Amino acid sequence: MRLLLIYHRMSKNNLTAGLINFIEDEIMPRYENFDKAHDRRHAFTVMSQSLQLTKFYEVDVAMVYTIAAYHDLGLSEGRAMHHTASARIVREDERLRQFFTPEQIETIADAVEDHRASNLHEPRTIYGKIIAEADRIIEPETIMTRTVQYGLSRYPTLTKDEHIERAVAHIKEKYGRGGYMRLWIPQSQNSVRLEEFRMMIDNENELKRSLEVIYSEQKACY
């Protein structure tokens, strides 16, 4: 992870060694307590994509980096309202005051709260749009794997067929035509990837076959 951040520090931004060390040493380890669909690797991916999107906007890179680091911490209190819990964690973390003003911290908290894909409202700021877009990792195999992993972690008593049906229903509800997935950054590649994924979702038999292969691979890990 440090190599990625060193690369980004070579461009004009305000990421400091102090903030990077704080995030990596104090914040990122908290993701190790979450399920595989929301683990440290996922957080790192969201951080990377968030930083890549900063090249399209005049934004505070340190804030974008911090938003991505905190966006899923509220999972420690459950999934249903994790976005609001994550925002509260930001507001209550006094350590952030050594890096940001109160106004910046409030913007960070708002963006963290706005990141969730099922939110009905548009993110309030460009920071919210960046984290929301970065968290939408539209790569079919990754999405299907994370969906299966989450099901195995949360619903261990389900049969194989029940897991597959749950995964199909979730993927259709979120990514299918008419699903609640919304994209906010026109410069990202997500719109093209989403349409490609929807073509796969349209063929439910193909979707189920792919999920069955992933289920067999992941089941051995649980």
List where the protein language model places each region.
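Divalent metal-dependent phosphate-bond-processing catalytic cores, especially two-metal-ion Mg2+/Mn2+ enzymes
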Residues: 11-14, 32-57, 70, 119-222
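Short amphipathic alpha-helical segments
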Residues: 20-25, 40-47, 62, 67
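An active-site-proximal "capping" alpha-helix that borders the catalytic cofactor pocket
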Residues: 46-47, 81-96
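Hydrophobic, well-structured mid-protein blocks that either form specific transmembrane helices
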Residues: 89-124
